Amino acid sequence: MRIPIKDVTPEIGHARIAGWVHEERDLGGLTFLLVRDRTGILQVTIPKKKVTPEVLAAVKEATRESVIECEGVVKATEKAPGGRELVPDMLRVVSRAETPLPLDVSEKVPAELDTRLDNRYLDLRKPRINAIFQIRNACLRAISEYLWDNGFTQVQTPKIVAAATEGGTELFPLAYFDKEAFLNQSPQLYKQMLMSAGFDRVFEIGAIFRAEEHNTVRHLNEATSIDIEMSFANEEDAMHVLENVVASAYQYVADHCGDALATLGITDFKVPTVPFPRITYKEAIEISTAGGEPLVFGDDLSTAAERIVGEKMGTMYFITEWPTSTRPFYTMPFEDRPEVCRAFDMMHPRMELTSGAQRCHIHSLLVEQIKAKGLNPDAFEFYLNPFRYGMPPHAGWGLGAERLVMTMLDLQNIREAVLFPRDRHRVSP
C-alpha cells in the first residue's frame, strides 16, 4: 500500500510511494529523484550499478513532473531532505510529463501571476501554493467546528434568485427558462427567512457572485462567503461570535499547520487577542481626516482611509454605528437616532473583512427602508411575508474566506487564496 511521504521513515524499513518528479540530478554513477506528494518531498537514490535494468529504464523515461511509483528500502542519511532516502527495487512511470513544462513547479524560474493562473493545475503543485490551501482548509474546518459547537445549523441557500439581495446593478443575469433570474450576491435574505422559520442559529459557507467591475488585488467576482444569522440577538452578540470565530481559525492554524506555515516562510504567526477593539464610524472618519484622508459623515471608507485607520489600530478591530444611508435596507437603525444604524465592519489593518448588523425585524419599517433605497417592495414579497407572521430580532454577518486567508498569510493578491479565480477578465480555467 502507498505510504504518504511525510510518514516514510527509516524505521519502516521498506516503503512504497507515489508522486511527481520534483527535480532530477544525474551524477554519473548516481541519479537522485526528488519525489513530491501532497505531504512532502522524498529523495529517491538510484545507484546505477545496484538497481535493475527496468528501474534504470524508468528513470531515463521520467521527466520533471512525471507521475511515478516506486518501492524500496528506506535509509537514514543526513544529506537528503528530511534525513532519509529511498533506494528503489521497483520504479515505474505512471504518467510521463511532456517537455518543456509551461511553468516551473520548483519556482527556480519565476512566472507572472497571469501565466501561473493560465496553468493553475501546475501552479497548485508548488509546495508553497499547496500550503495556502492546506491553511484555507484548516480555517474553514475550524470555523465550522466552532459554529457547530455553539449551536449553529449549517444550511445551503439558493444561488439562483429572482431579486437582488441588496439592490443595485451588481448582478449576473441568467437565462432561466422564461423567467428573469440572477446569480445570488449573498444568502442574506434566506438567512433571515430561516430566523422566521425558527432555526435560531444558522451558518453557510458558499459561493457569492458580484458583477463589480473592480480589477484590484482585493476583489473577485466569485468568492466564498462565511455567513451566520442568529435570533434574539443584536449587533454586539454577532460581533462576539465573529471575533471568536476568527480567533479560533487562527488558533487552529497555529496548532495544526506548522509545516504549511514554515513552507510559506511564516515564523511569527500570531493569534489575535479577543475581544477586538471597537471604534465608531465617527471616530474612524476623524482618524482618517487627521491622517490626511478627509471624510465627512456619510462617506464610505476609502482604501486610503482603511490604511490610515488600520495603521493606528494595529490589530483586528470593529467599526460600529454606521450611517444608515451607507447600509442595506435590512439594517436596523437606532430608535433614538435613525440616521445611524446597528451595523459594523470587522477590519484587518489592511482591509475590511466582514460586514454585519442587527437586522430590521419590523415589517412596516422594512418596507419603508426598501422604498427609501429606491426599490420596489413588490419585488421582495417572498422575503417580506415572513416578517408579517412573527419575526424575532436577529443579527448576523458575512466573512470573505479569501480575504481572511489573504490577510492571515500576508498574500499580496486575493487571487492567490482561491483555486481558480474569477474576475472581470478571467473565466477559465
Curated annotation (Swiss-Prot):
Residues 188-191 are annotated as: Aspartate. Keywords: Aminoacyl-tRNA synthetase, ATP-binding, Cytoplasm, Ligase, Magnesium, Metal-binding, Nucleotide-binding, Protein biosynthesis. Mg(2+) 3 binds at E352. CDD domains: AsxRS_core (cd00776). One of its GO terms (cellular component) is cytosol. Its cofactor is Mg(2+). Mg(2+) 2 binds at E352, S355. The keyword Magnesium applies. GO terms for biological process: aspartyl-tRNA aminoacylation. Binds 3 Mg(2+) cations per subunit. The strongest magnesium site (Mg1) is bound to the beta- and gamma-phosphates of ATP and four water molecules complete its coordination sphere. L-aspartate binds at E166, R210, S355, R359. Its main location: cytoplasm. ATP binds at R210, A211, E212, R218, H219, L220, E352, G400, A401, E402, R403. It is found in: Cytoplasm. The record marks P81 as: Important for tRNA non-discrimination. Its EC number is 6.1.1.23. InterPro entries: Aa-tRNA-synt_II, aa-tRNA-synth_II, aa-tRNA-synth_II/BPL/LPL, Asp-tRNA_synthase_2, Asp/Asn-tRNA-synth_IIb, NA-bd_OB-fold, NA-bd_OB_tRNA. GO terms for molecular function: aspartate-tRNA ligase activity; aspartate-tRNA(Asn) ligase activity; ATP binding; magnesium ion binding; RNA binding. It catalyses: tRNA(Asx) + L-aspartate + ATP = L-aspartyl-tRNA(Asx) + AMP + diphosphate. Pfam families: tRNA-synt_2, tRNA_anti-codon. It comes from the Archaea. Aspartyl-tRNA synthetase with relaxed tRNA specificity since it is able to aspartylate not only its cognate tRNA(Asp) but also tRNA(Asn). Reaction proceeds in two steps: L-aspartate is first activated by ATP to form Asp-AMP and then transferred to the acceptor end of tRNA(Asp/Asn). Homodimer. Belongs to the class-II aminoacyl-tRNA synthetase family. Type 2 subfamily. This is Aspartate--tRNA(Asp/Asn) ligase. The gene is aspS.
